[in-house]
Amino acid sequence: MAVGKEILTKIRSVQNTQKITRAMQMVSTSKMRKTQERMRAARPYAEKVRTVMAHLAQANAELGHPLLARRETIKRAGIILVSSDKGLCGGLNVNSFKRFFGKVKELQDQGIEVDVCCLGQKGLAAAQRARLNVVASAVHLGDMPKMEKLIGPLTVLFRQYAEGELDAVYIVYSSFVNTMKQEPALEQLLPLTPHHMVVEHSHSWDYLYEPDAPTLMEFLVRRYLESVVYQALAENMASEQAARMVAMKAATDNAGNTIKQLRLVYNKARQAAITTELSEIVAGAAAV
């Protein structure tokens, strides 16, 4: 029964793997709920900052900001690539990378140079393999990323844009649609498009600004951009946990099917061995 022992060894190995994938599925399910709550909680803040900023810009048309300036021609662009730090999340990162590299190729075909800021280990590794110009990165952000870890890398791109070194900034991430569906998203971060600066007026009054409108505008623009990036990161993390939960469930189910097939093969091999032994015993008895 050497073959039978090998099959039993395979069964135990697959069972051990199944325990791991089932545990990862349960952990991802728990984390997914938390990341979804964090994602939903971040939206009202970003929307309120955008509303106040838009109201300020419309009420004070003379206000300007380097991050709001539009360029006539784009010679150099920056792309923020949001990805996961870990794998085992299905095709989540692959789909985002396809969107990212597609945009990079589109820009390069137009003669536009590209700088990259990576948020997540997988994206950083992919950009480095492609030998892109990575100007900033933040990895190992954890399950509850802090804004402090993002400010440094984002400041690099924002400063480049304000100083005229970059003419546009984009962000690529995985948008959370539902548990079973996550889509790669590409958005223009800078310059702010007109729909970002539009707000419906239901009143004719204006805010009182302390210390003054330009200082407040400087604060709001940066906070708005940071909140948009944080929202994208929160959506990407929710997508990551959902994709990992689905992937681990599929792996657990596949392991169960493999175990059933191996047990069937083992039972057939055992039955054949018993039949052979009985035949040998009967043949020996007949010979006597």
Swiss-Prot record:
Alphabetical list of InterPro entries matching this protein: ATP_synth_F1_ATPase_gsu, ATP_synth_F1_gsu, ATP_synth_F1_gsu_CS
Protein name per the record: ATP synthase gamma chain
Gene name, Swiss-Prot/TrEMBL: atpG
Taxonomic lineage of the native organism: Bacteria, Pseudomonadati, Pseudomonadota, Betaproteobacteria, Neisseriales
Family from the record: Belongs to the ATPase gamma chain family.
GO cellular component: plasma membrane; proton-transporting ATP synthase complex
PROSITE patterns according to UniProt: ATPASE_GAMMA (PS00153)
Membrane topology: Peripheral membrane protein
Source organism: Chromobacterium violaceum (strain ATCC 12472 / DSM 30191 / JCM 1249 / CCUG 213 / NBRC 12614 / NCIMB 9131 / NCTC 9757 / MK)
Pfam families: ATP-synt
A GO term for molecular function: ATP binding
Domain of life: Bacteria
Record keywords: ATP synthesis, Cell inner membrane, Cell membrane, CF(1), Hydrogen ion transport, Ion transport, Membrane, Transport
Gene Ontology process terms (BP): proton motive force-driven plasma membrane ATP synthesis
NCBIfam families in alphabetical order: ATPsyn_F1gamma, PRK05621.1-1
Localization: Cell inner membrane
Subunit structure: F-type ATPases have 2 components, CF(1) - the catalytic core - and CF(0) - the membrane proton channel. CF(1) has five subunits: alpha(3), beta(3), gamma(1), delta(1), epsilon(1). CF(0) has three main subunits: a, b and c.
